[in-house]
Amino acid sequence: MPKALITGASSGIGECIAKELSEKGYETVLVARDTEKLKKLRKELGAESFIETVDLADMEGVARLYSRHTDVDVLVNCAGLGIFGEFEKSDFQEECNMLDVNIKALQLLMKKYLPEMKRRGGKILNVASSAAFFPGPLFSSYYASKAYVYRLSLAVREELRREKAPVTISVFCPGPVKTPFNEKVGVNAGMGAITPEYAAKCAVNGMFRGKAVITPGIINKASRLFSGFLPDTFYAKIVYSLQRAKQKQGGNEK
């Protein structure tokens, strides 16, 4: 039975991706910090699933996770944190913790799994965001981290293509999704938000088709298409206004 490891599996898109892969016959390794939520999901998925309570900000813990599950066919890097607010007022340690989860854990898992995947084949799905396409005032470090994931994914994908390696890397860039993430950072997802179930289905189907960039929804596809047509300074103004409006709707106005 093929095996898939999914980080951020306790809720939202990660949980729904785990369900999608389980339905496709994958043994799933469910990774997150919330043990109780993972147990609940494992019970729902059945016997062919394992839970791993790991703080992905701890690189030693990430390395131990790999050592327990070296035979993975699909790696899904879905765990992510966000910090909303003005950059100057954001706590530096919280930002470092976010970057550890959003970037360092993802990068370490890719480095760990790629050698074996190149020998036996595999797929990597990195969950970024449409935030990767724009500068993000009031969400600056989060947007920047997703841009890193986006560029890293495409760069390593090209390296693998030139090596003719049997591995594909896909990067998933959804717009707003109705998940607990929005409540945690204190913003409203907005009227155009998609469900995590729909997002997961798009992500998994796109990954198995070998797509480089997966962008669900017409509006999201258009935003990616037009992101390079105008100066980033223009988009920064637009994003600031949108984020401020979401902040007010989410009840996090200060």
Locate each region found by the language model.
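Conserved NAD(P)H cofactor-binding loop of Rossmann-fold oxidoreductase domains
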Residues: C78-I83
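Residue(s) in the substrate-gating loop at a strand-loop-helix junction
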Residues: S129
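Active-site helix of classical SDR
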Residues: M110, S145
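Substrate-binding pocket helix/loop in short-chain dehydrogenase/reductase
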Residues: E86-F87, E94-L99
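Conserved glycine-rich cofactor-binding loop
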Residues: S10-S11
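Conserved glycine-rich Rossmann-like NAD(P)H-binding loop of the short-chain dehydrogenase/reductase
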Residues: K24-K40
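C-terminal helical subdomain
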Residues: V171, N188-R224
